[in-house]
Amino acid sequence: MPIMAGTASPWRREAVFLTAMLVVETSVVGISTLFKFATSKGLNIYPFLGYSYLLASLLLLPSLFFTNRSSSLPPLSVSILSKIGLLGFLGSMYVITGYIGIEYSSPTLASAINNITPALTFILAIIFRMEKVSFKERSSLAKLMGTILSLIGALVVIFYHGPRVFLASSPPYVNFRQFSPPLSSSNSDWLIGGALLTMQGIFVSVSFILQAHIMSVYPAAFRVSFLYTVCVSIVTSTIGLVVEKNNPSVWIIHFDITLITIVTMAIVTSVYYVIHSWTVRHKGPLYLAIFKPLSILIAVVMGAIFLNDSLYLGCLIGGILITLGFYAVMWGKANEEKDQLSFSEKEKTPLLLNRKNDQV
């Protein structure tokens, strides 16, 4: 690609990265919205996940022949395969809890809860002693305060609806029931959905920690992604066969919204991994994270257009708190990495001076 060869102007390079991130966030929210709509037409979650990840793995398969062919890679040992298998199991749990949570609630709630992942990762990193909290450092305080804000925001989104801030009118081409919970029997569904989406966040956080470990010992992003999607397809299909053992007809896919949703999910999943790896390589993980809160706004717009979703005050307040907490955690992580870099440079300076003195 010429744009990445260093010949293009900086603003064009930034435009490419910006467009890629907007495509990723819109696609991820879009598939959640499409899934929510398809469930009303009879889509079952287990065939949806099993077939989608199987097709995604087939789409990722060609990348294995063009990437990670370096001889410096360690052999794909049983230990590494078992860790990727565990990652696939965690991934299966997070997509199952996530999409069932969307069935009970809405893509807007899913997007809001998804943004507490950095806070949950920070908490788990402290529990596993991968992070240390120092009240004397601004970065630690920022991550701590951001975590608290994110968790408060999540509680507000789940437990407080409040009045409607925006009332969506049903589009003429969508004959669909109101998804935002009225203050009646649907409140319990909203709470169940929020609990499942929070569980999804925990699974994602543990997956991030395990994925970072796997990539440190086996830095082959596309190969790991391929094996991961295969594992998720196997695990979700196996669980589905057990859960739906008395209903085998759910595995028959018809040429309707069900097939469209499965194919779209597979394409989004495979493209997401490609753009994710490409962006992290060229811009770093922080750049990728900056765009996550946009998913809340995108979900609100898509929900209003396609699902007749209304926006409640609780979701608005909680979304703002989660976004502030998200950026506080990201700011703390960025400053922590900056401090570590400057500290390592200071350590190198005396060594260089000593070498010069020895040469003299």
Curated annotation (Swiss-Prot):
Keywords: Membrane, Transmembrane, Transmembrane helix. It is a multi-pass membrane protein. Residues 30-158 form the EamA domain. It is found in: Membrane. One of its GO terms (molecular function) is transmembrane transporter activity. GO terms for cellular component: membrane. The chain crosses the membrane at residues 15-35, 45-65, 84-104, 108-128, 140-160, 190-210, 224-244, 248-268, 286-306, 311-331. It comes from the Eukaryota. Its main location: membrane. It holds the Pfam family EamA. Belongs to the drug/metabolite transporter (DMT) superfamily. Plant drug/metabolite exporter (P-DME) (TC 2.A.7.4) family. This is WAT1-related protein At3g28070. It comes from Arabidopsis thaliana (Mouse-ear cress).
